[in-house]
Regions:
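Phosphate-handling substructures
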Residues: 63-121
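Active-site-proximal alpha-helix that buttresses catalytic centers in soluble enzyme cores
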Residues: 2-4, 8-67
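Solvent-exposed, charged/polar functional surfaces in cytosolic regulatory/catalytic domains
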Residues: 39, 124-125
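Short Gly/charged-rich anion-binding patches and loops
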Residues: 55-58, 95, 124
Length: 125
């Protein structure tokens, strides 16, 4: 039986600042993230697939050194649209952000993807 293990990338500077870091912001891992990831142990795998984002390829390379990395564009993170690379403090007072919050995150990101579009793209990959 095929077993699929999904792993989120290690921490980036934008993550530390609680920013919406998605498809439009290609930033590397923080130095300490690499050290933390290197201490983790994962089972032997047959194949490694990753988003083309540098933080994802770095994470895969640290966790599975020596394994061929298969890049799948459709696995890239969500397109946060006008929220990209901003945190909740910077979005305070933004009517689109407040509408999105009030919807429980169900509305599409303004200028970005909806949850359904993001899911469909990832599943296609």
């Amino acid at each position: 039986m095929l077993k699929l293990i999904l792993i989120r990338h290690g921490e980036t500077q934008g993550n530390k600042l609680k920013r919406y870091i998605g498809k439009r912001t290609d930033e590397p891992l923080c130095p300490e993230a690499g050290n933390m990831l290197a201490q983790l142990a994962y089972p032997e795998v047959q194949a490694v697939y990753a988003s083309p984002m540098i933080r994802c390829t770095q994470t895969a390379g640290i966790l599975f050194p020596g394994k061929k990395l298969n890049i799948i564009d459709e696995l890239a993170e969500c397109d946060f649209g006008e929220f990209e690379n901003k945190n909740y403090q910077e979005l305070d007072g933004n009517e689109h952000y407040q509408s999105w919050i009030d919807s429980g995150g169900l509305l599409p990101f303004p200028g970005g993807e909806s949850r359904e579009e993001f899911k469909r793209r990832n599943v296609t990959g």
